Structure formats: structure tokens, C-alpha cells
């Protein structure tokens, strides 16, 4: 399997370790990821789409065109990028007026969107195409001592009427992937609540965003979580860097380790922590490594 790898903004600039972890984990699972030359911001659906939908749609379509030129479907590890590109492709498929408008703009840079590719989230790809049985086969370091609080995020499952990935209210997809590593997914209060960062809230109303993050982290800890696992670098940033900001603004310290799903899988596959770049997180992951007996 080969896919066009859409990086987005947060991962390469703030968490390049997630990028590396994704590359080597997917390689282990038989998936080749090829970088997309000239790709831009997705762009962020909650920001661009709110102010100017036509501009958002045109920029997203340009990224889709790059993958079409490569002859590859897109895979991304970011919920926001997935939401933006998937929903743009859906609109362009369903709305000829929007397609004509976008292609008129794209024609000026020598591109045309044809609608020949699909947009995939890497967790969806793992679950639907690779399968949890393959994950189990690849596990060399069972994570059976680890209690994991899963964070789905907002754009992964919704809008559910067009994505059809899983139940938007009682999902199980990530639980099954995490459980395949031997780790125990733990249920906690407000399980599907936003991390607090999305929709421009972090950028404009940081205290409000941190209040939401703080509530989620408290709930995770009360449920006995050793760490939280996400499938979105922006959510990852909010939980990881957000804990530092919570201490600075509210004087409250939590220290809940934060892992992207690719990093959790990498640990289960026996990959070295330094290859997964977990040491560069704002909140130390050492308690997780110590519990797993990893030096």
C-alpha cells in the first residue's frame, strides 16, 4: 500500500517526532508514505471555513490536486487536516457549482480537481485496511500494564453523516486498536468532549481552552489513566503544552503523559523511545516508559 502523506502544520513544526513515528510504524505495517511536494495548510476548517468558505475550499482542493497528480490517495494523522480535506472532497463531489468555482480558480495555477482520490485518516486505515489482528501480530512489547485514556477529538468522527467511520456517540475503533497492543482503554467522564483547542478557541480564548483541557485531564486521571492517547497533533499540543500553560495560568500541575497513537504503537512494536521522539514532549513520558520497563 502506498499513500500521499499529508503532514499539515502542527506535526512538522511542533511534533516532528509524531511524523517520524508514523513513518516507521506504517512502514512496519507495510504502508509506504510519500511526501506531497508543495502541500500547504489544509487549511484549518474551523478558521478558514468560518470566515471564507470559498477560499477554504479552493486551498483544500489545491492540496487534493497534488495527490491526484501523484496518483495516490491521501493519508493524514491530523483530525483537522482529515476533516478539512475529506469534507472539501465531499462538497466538490456533491456540488457542481462549487466544483466549477474552484476549478476556475485552480486553472490560473495550471491545476484542475477531478475527484479521483480518497482522503483517509491513518487510524481509519489501520482499523479498516490493516486490521487489529495485524497489530497484534506486530506486538513484541505488550503494553498490558498500561491504562490508556483515549481522546478521539472532534473532526475524526464528525460530521458522521458523511464520514461513516464509527458511532459518533459510542465509538470503539480506537479502543480496539489500543487494546490490540495489550493496553487497557479506560472510560472517563466527558469522554468525547473537545480538547479545548479547536475552532480558534486556543488562539483567541486561551483561558477558556485550558479550562476544557484541565477538565478532561482531571477526568482521565480520576479514571486511573497512566497516559492519554490521541490521533491529532493539535489535540496532542493542547494536552501536552496545555498542561504547562495550566500550571503557569492556574498554578495547577498534572503531569499526565501524552502520546500520539503512532507513538503508542511504536512502543508496542518494540521501537526505541528515541526513534519515536517521546523525550521532546513538554510533559515527560518517563513514567510510562518506567511502568513498561523500557530504559
UniProtKB/Swiss-Prot annotation:
It is an enzyme of class 1 (oxidoreductase). It comes from the Archaea. One of its GO terms (biological process) is methanogenesis. InterPro entries: CoB/CoM_hetero-S_Rdtase_bsu (IPR017678), Cys_rich_dom (IPR004017), HdrB/HdrD_reductase (IPR051278). Keywords: Methanogenesis, Oxidoreductase. Gene3D superfamilies: 1.20.1050.140. Pfam families: CCG. One of its GO terms (molecular function) is CoB--CoM heterodisulfide reductase activity. Its EC number is 1.8.98.-. Pathway: Cofactor metabolism; coenzyme M-coenzyme B heterodisulfide reduction; coenzyme B and coenzyme M from coenzyme M-coenzyme B heterodisulfide: step 1/1. Coiled coil: none annotated. The keyword Cytoplasm does not apply. Part of a complex that catalyzes the reversible reduction of CoM-S-S-CoB to the thiol-coenzymes H-S-CoM (coenzyme M) and H-S-CoB (coenzyme B). Belongs to the HdrB family. NCBIfam families: CoB_CoM_SS_B. The heterodisulfide reductase is composed of three subunits; HdrA, HdrB and HdrC. This is CoB--CoM heterodisulfide reductase subunit B 2. The gene is hdrB2.
Amino acid at each position: 500500500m502506498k499513500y500521499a502523506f499529508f503532514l499539515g502544520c502542527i506535526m512538522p513544526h511542533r511534533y516532528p517526532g509524531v511524523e517520524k513515528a508514523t513513518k516507521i510504524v506504517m512502514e512496519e505495517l507495510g504502508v509506504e508514505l510519500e511526501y506531497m511536494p508543495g502541500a500547504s495548510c489544509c487549511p484549518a476548517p474551523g478558521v478558514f471555513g468560518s470566515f471564507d468558505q470559498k477560499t477554504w475550499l479552493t486551498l483544500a482542493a489545491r492540496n487534493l490536486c497534488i495527490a491526484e497528480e501523484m496518483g495516490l490517495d491521501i493519508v493524514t494523522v491530523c483530525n483537522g487536516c482529515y476533516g478539512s480535506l475529506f469534507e472539501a472532497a465531499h462538497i466538490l463531489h456533491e456540488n457542481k457549482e462549487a466544483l466549477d468555482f474552484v476549478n476556475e480558480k485552480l486553472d490560473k495555477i495550471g491545476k484542475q480537481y477531478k475527484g479521483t482520490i480518497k482522503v483517509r485518516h491513518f487510524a481509519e486505515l489501520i482499523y479498516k485496511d490493516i486490521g487489529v489482528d495485524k497489530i497484534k501480530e506486530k506486538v513484541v512489547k505488550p503494553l498490558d500494564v498500561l491504562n490508556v485514556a483515549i481522546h478521539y477529538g472532534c473532526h475524526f468522527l464528525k460530521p458522521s453523516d458523511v464520514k461513516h467511520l464509527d458511532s459518533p456517540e459510542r465509538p470503539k475503533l480506537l479502543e480496539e486498536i489500543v487494546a490490540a497492543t495489550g493496553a487497557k482503554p479506560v472510560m472517563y467522564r466527558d469522554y468525547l468532549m473537545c480538547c479545548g483547542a479547536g475552532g480558534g478557541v486556543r488562539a483567541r480564548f486561551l483561558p477558556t481552552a485550558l479550562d476544557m483541557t484541565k477538565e478532561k485531564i482531571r477526568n482521565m486521571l480520576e479514571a486511573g489513566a497512566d497516559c492519554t492517547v490521541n490521533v491529532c497533533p493539535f489535540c496532542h499540543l493542547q494536552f501536552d503544552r496545555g498542561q504547562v500553560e495550566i500550571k503557569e495560568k492556574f498554578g495547577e500541575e498534572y503531569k499526565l503523559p501524552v502520546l500520539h497513537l503512532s507513538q503508542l504503537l511504536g512502543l508496542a512494536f518494540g521501537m526505541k523511545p528515541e526513534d519515536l521522539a517521546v523525550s521532546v514532549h513538554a510533559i515527560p513520558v518517563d513514567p510510562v516508559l518506567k511502568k513498561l520497563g523500557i530504559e
